[in-house]
C-alpha cells in the first residue's frame, strides 16, 4: 500500500482509558479528569479522553480549547472574515492544501519521544537575591527578570563588580568636587555629571600641551564635545514647551504634494508593515482634509475636532520616515527633501497635544493610533524614549492596552466579529462616509494583533510580565485572514503566553524543563510559519529576523539564570555544563552581531528597515557586554582556563565593546551613556596575572565595610549603606571574621567556605572548557577600526598629570602591611586553609585599592 493510500485510510478511533496527552507522551496516566501527570505538567486544558468511535474528546469547554468559529457565515464574517470553521465545504482547494501542509508539519514535529527526565518538573530560582527595585527622584522602577540590573543583582560576581564601580566613581567625584572641578550641564541628566567632570579635568590639565598631542587629540576633543552637545540637544528639544495659540502647522509640515509623493509613499511601501494600524485610504483622506482646512486656509488647529491628533500623526510619520532614511546609510540623494525637514521639535509638539486631551480618561481611534506611533518611535529613535533597559515603556504600553480594551479592541474582534453593533455618530472622526463598521473591524484586528505581539515581545526581551492576560488558539486562512505579519503570529500567542506564565507566576520557582519544552515548541512552530511564507515579499523579512533574535535573547538570559542557580545550589556537573552552554550562546550571538554589521547583505534585511532592526541588535549586543565579565571573574575556578585564556576573554570583551560602541555609540543616546561604565568594567578586568581583579574587588569592598563601621566612609546619611546595597559582602565579612584574628587569603575563604562550589575543580567531572577561539577570531583581531577613530578605545584616554594629588590618601598602616603577597588563584584552589595576616590588616587606603586596578595615568580618563 502506498503512502497516499495510507493517508486516505480512515482510522477507527478506539475508546481510550488514558488521556490523549499521556498516550502521546507514553507516560503513566492515573485516568482521572484531569490526570495527575497533566496537572503536574500544566496541560490541564488539553487533558482529554476519547470516549466514542467518532473520536470526539470528552472534556468540558475552556477558553483555550473553545472553537470560536461560527457555524454559519454571517454578514460580518463575509465582510471581514476571521476565525474559520474547520469544514471541508467552507474552504477552497488552496486553503485545504495549505492547512494539510500545516497539519503534516505539526504531526511530524509533535510525535517525538520525550525523555522522562525532561517531562519531570525541575524548578530553579531566578531571584536568589530578590527582585531589583530602584527608587530615585524622577522614577521608581521594578526591573524585569532579564534586564541588566536584574542580571547583575542575580549574579554575585557582577553585583560586587558593579558596587565597586559605583563607589570608585563616587570617591573620585568627591575628590574632584572638593577642588571645585565639578561640571554640570543642565540639559543632561545627573548621571552625566561624572562624565563631564572627568573630561573637563582631563582637558584642563593638558591644555598647555595641545600642540604636542597633534591631530589625534584635536579630533578626540571635537568628536567628544559634539556628542555631548548632540545628546544635550536631544533632551532640550524634547523638553521644549509650546502654546497652542502660537503653533502654525505650516511652519512644521512640508507641502501636501511632497508629503504624499515622498513621505507617505515611503511609509506605505517600507514602514507600514511594521506598524499596520491604519486603513491607508482613510489616513490619506484625513491628511488631505487637514491640509485643506488647516494648512492651506490657515485655520487654527482645533482640539475639539481632533485636528491636533491628525497633526501629531503626520509629525510622527515624518519623523519615523526620516529615521528610516537616516539609518539606512544610503546616499543622501535618496529622499533629499525628507532629509531636509527639521524634525527636532516634533516629539515635543506631540507630547504637548497628547496631554491637551483627556488621555487618562477616554480615547478615540485617532488618539490611540497616535499613542501607538509614539510607542513605536520610542523603540526606534536614538533618543532615550524607553530608557537604557526598556524600563520606561510599560506605562505608555499600559495606557495603550487600557485604551484598546475601553474601545472594544480585544480578542472579540477575532472570536466574535459578528457580535459588534456600531453606532457611529455624525461628528466621529473618521466619519461614517469614509469608515464603515467593517472597516472598523479590520482596523481593530490590525491594532489588537500589533499591540498583543508587542506585549509578548517585551516579556521575551526584559522578562517583564505580560499586561494582556488572555490568549486564544487561532487558525486563519493563508491569504484572506492574514493581511499582516502580526495577525499571522497570533497562532503563536498561546505558546508565548504560556512561556510568560511559567516565567512570571513564581520567579522563585520556575519549571525549567517546561520552559525548555515551550521554547522548543515556539521555535518549531515559528519555523513552520516561516516555511509556509517563503514567497513573502522581502519587505517582511525583518520581522522574522527580529523574532529569531528575540528568542535567542530569551535563551541567553535564561541560561545565565540557570547557571547562577546551579552555582548557588552546588550542582557541579550542571554548573559546568551551563557555564559552557552560556559561553557558546554568547559566542553564537556575537557572531550574529558581527554579521549584522559587516555582512548585512547576507541577512537579506532591507537597509530602510535597519532603524527598526537596530534596536533588537543593540539590546542583544549589550547583553553580551553585561554577561562576559561574569566569565572573566569566574575564570580562575577552572583548571582548564589558564591566564592566557582569560586574556583572550578580555580581548573578546574589547572587540565586542569596540563594535557595539562604534556602530551605535555615535547615534544612540542610551549606548553613549553605557560607555562610561563599560570602559570601567574593561579597566577592572584587564589586569596582569598577579593582580587578580576579583581579589582586589573583594579586598576593596571588605575595606569599605570596615570604614562604614568606623564612621569613616564617604557615604552620608542620605545614602544607602554598603551592607544594604550588596548584602552578600556583609555575609562574606562575617565569614572572614570567624578566623579569630588570623585568616587565609580572602579568595580561599570565598571559594572554599563562603561559596563552596569553588572548592570543586573540573578534574572531578572531567570537564574541559571549550574557548571557541575560531569563532571568536573576528573580535580578537579587531582591525575594523584601525584606520579610523575607535570611540571605545580613544575616549578619555588622555591622562591628567594631577591624578596622583587626587588619589593620595593618608594611611594608618605601614607600606609593608599593605603589600600583601598576591598568590595566583590556581594555587589557592589546591592548598588547604592556613593562617596568614591579622584580620584588621584588611583596613587599607581605599585609594590604594583603586590605584591597584586603574593605572594612575588613566583613572580620571576612564569613560
Curated annotation (Swiss-Prot):
<dbReference type="GO" id="GO:0005634">
    <property type="term" value="C:nucleus"/>
</dbReference>
<dbReference type="InterPro" id="IPR050675">
    <property type="entry name" value="OAF3"/>
</dbReference>
<keyword id="KW-0963">Cytoplasm</keyword>
<dbReference type="GO" id="GO:0045944">
    <property type="term" value="P:positive regulation of transcription by RNA polymerase II"/>
</dbReference>
<keyword id="KW-0539">Nucleus</keyword>
<keyword id="KW-0238">DNA-binding</keyword>
<keyword id="KW-0805">Transcription regulation</keyword>
<dbReference type="InterPro" id="IPR036864">
    <property type="entry name" value="Zn2-C6_fun-type_DNA-bd_sf"/>
</dbReference>
<feature type="DNA-binding region" description="Zn(2)-C6 fungal-type">
    <location>
        <begin position="18"/>
        <end position="47"/>
    </location>
</feature>
<feature type="compositionally biased region" description="Polar residues">
    <location>
        <begin position="52"/>
        <end position="63"/>
    </location>
</feature>
<dbReference type="GO" id="GO:0000981">
    <property type="term" value="F:DNA-binding transcription factor activity, RNA polymerase II-specific"/>
</dbReference>
<dbReference type="GO" id="GO:0008270">
    <property type="term" value="F:zinc ion binding"/>
</dbReference>
<dbReference type="InterPro" id="IPR001138">
    <property type="entry name" value="Zn2Cys6_DnaBD"/>
</dbReference>
<dbReference type="GO" id="GO:0000122">
    <property type="term" value="P:negative regulation of transcription by RNA polymerase II"/>
</dbReference>
<dbReference type="GO" id="GO:0003677">
    <property type="term" value="F:DNA binding"/>
</dbReference>
<protein>
    <recommendedName>
        <fullName>Oleate activated transcription factor 3</fullName>
    </recommendedName>
</protein>
<comment type="function">
    <text>Transcriptional inhibitor with a significantly increased number of target genes in response to oleate.</text>
</comment>
<comment type="similarity">
    <text>Belongs to the OAF3 family.</text>
</comment>
<dbReference type="GO" id="GO:0071400">
    <property type="term" value="P:cellular response to oleic acid"/>
</dbReference>
<keyword id="KW-0479">Metal-binding</keyword>
<dbReference type="GO" id="GO:0005737">
    <property type="term" value="C:cytoplasm"/>
</dbReference>
<dbReference type="GO" id="GO:0005739">
    <property type="term" value="C:mitochondrion"/>
</dbReference>
<dbReference type="Pfam" id="PF00172">
    <property type="entry name" value="Zn_clus"/>
</dbReference>
<feature type="region of interest" description="Disordered">
    <location>
        <begin position="52"/>
        <end position="99"/>
    </location>
</feature>
<keyword id="KW-0496">Mitochondrion</keyword>
<keyword id="KW-0862">Zinc</keyword>
<keyword id="KW-0678">Repressor</keyword>
<keyword id="KW-0804">Transcription</keyword>
